[in-house]
Amino acid sequence: MDRRKSVRIIGFVYAGYLMRYVYLIIVVPFYGRMLGVAGYGRVLASMSLMNVIWMLVNYGFSPVGMRDVSKAQSVEECNDIFSLHVSARIFHGLVGGCIGLIATMCSPVLSQHPLIGVLATLLGIVSGMNLGWMFQGRHQFRTPIVIEVFGFLLSLVLVLTLVKGPNDAIWVLASLLVAGVASSVVSYGLTIYQLGWPRLRLAGIVPLVRNSTMLFLYSSGSVVFTASSTYLLTLLSTPEQVGYFGAAERFATIALALMGPAAQVFIPTITRQLAQGDVQGAHQTTRHGAALLMAYGLLIFCGALALSPFVLPLILGASFEPSSHVLQIFAWMFPFAAFNEFVAGYVFVPRKKDRLLAVVGIASGLINLIAALILAPRYGATGIALARVIGEAMLSVMLMGVVIRLELISLVPGGTRALGMVRVACGFRPETRSAEDE
C-alpha cells in the first residue's frame, strides 16, 4: 500500500471514529444529568460487565482471524476462516452468557436490577460476534466504520427518545442492544453476500482456540482487567466511587481508543508485507506507526493533566468534580499505553510472537489485580486508577526488555541510539549487529 493511499484510508477511518466521540460527547453528559451518579454508576457497571463478556467471546480470535485473512488467496479460503470463527464464537457466546448471569447475581450493584445485567451480557455476546476483523483482514477498512456509524446513530436516537429519568438505566442497555443487533445483521449480510453462508461445525474449533489462547492470555492479563475495572470497584467500594471512576475511565477510554483506527490499517498492512517477504517495507511501516502512537500518547498525557479540572465538571456537572482528579491520575498511563499498543500490535502480532505477549500480559494482569485489591478499598476511585497506571508501566518495562532481547529495538524510533547510550554509560560494549526478524 503506497503512502498516499495509506494516509487517505487512515484519514477516512479517523473521520468515522470522530462520530464515535461525537456520540459520546452527547450521551455521557446526558447520562450524567438524566440518571444521576447512582444511575450512571449502574450503567457503567453493566457496561464493564459487557466488555468482559465481549473479551471472553472474542477470546483472541480477532487478531488471529485478521492475520489469516490477510494471507488468504481465495474466496473459498476466506469462507473457511469465516465459518470456523463464527462456529467458535457461538460456542464461546454460550459460555459467556452463563458467566454474565453469575456475575450479575454476585454484584451488589447489578443484582438490585438484574435485567440490566442480562441485557449487558447479551450486548457483550453480540459485540463479541462482530466481523470487523474480517473486513480489516481483507483491507476493506471503510466498511466496518460505516456500519459502526450506523449503529451509533440508531442507538443515539433510541437513547434520547427512551431515557427520561433516573430510573431509565435499563433503556440505555436496551437501546445499545437493539443497535448492536441491527449492525450485526448488516455486517453478516454483507459478508455472506461476498463469501457465502458460513458452514457451522465443531471440527477445527479446538485448534483455533489453542492458536488463539496466547493472545487471549495477553488480553486477559491487561485488556480484561481494563474492561472489568468498574465492575471490580462495585465489589470493593460505594456506588458514588463507581460513578466517579467510571466517568473518568470513560474519558480515558475515549483517548486510548483513538489509537485503534491507525492499528486497523497498520497491523493488516504489516502482516501482509511480512507474508509477501517485504521485510524492509514492514519495518518501515512499523516505524511510521510507532512515531504516530508515541506522539499521540504524549499529547493526551499533557492534555489530560492540564484540562481535566476544567473539562469534566463542565461536561458532567459539579457533582462529578472528583472525577477530574481520577482522570489526572489516568494521564500518567497514556504514554505507557501508547508504547504497549505499538509493541504488542505493530511488532509482536504480525510477527507471531503470541506466546511472549501471553507471558507479559499475565504478569501485568497480576500486578494490576494485586495493586487494585490493595488500593481500591482504601482510596476508592483514585486507588484503582493508580493500579491501572502501575500495571501499564510494568507492562512497558517487560515489553521493552523483550524487544531488546529479540534485537527488534531498531523498530522503536530512537531506540537503537538510546540503548547504545545506556550501554556506554553502564560500561558495556556497544552492540553492532543488525536487528533480526522472523
Label every model-predicted segment.
Residues M1-S6, R142-I145, A169-I170, L176, ...:
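Interhelical loop/hinge segments that connect adjacent transmembrane helices in multipass membrane
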Residues K5-S62, T213-E240, L369-L373, R388, ...:
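Signature of the first transmembrane helix
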Residues R8-Y21, S46, N51, M55-M105, ...:
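Membrane-water interface segments that mark the loop-to-transmembrane alpha-helix transition
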Residues Y23-G39, T161-K164, V223-I254, R272-Q273, ...:
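Helix-terminus/linker motif at the lipid-water interface of multi-pass membrane proteins
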Residues V37-A38, T104-A120, L307-F336, T382:
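Interfacial segments at transmembrane-helix termini and the short loops linking adjacent helices
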Residues N58-S74, V86, A252-V279, H283, ...:
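Helix-loop junctions and terminal segments of transmembrane helices
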Residues E77, G124-I147, F334-V360:
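Membrane-interface junctions at transmembrane-helix termini in multi-pass inner-membrane proteins
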Residues P114-G124, I145-Y193, A363-I367, A381-R405:
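Hydrophobic alpha-helical transmembrane segments
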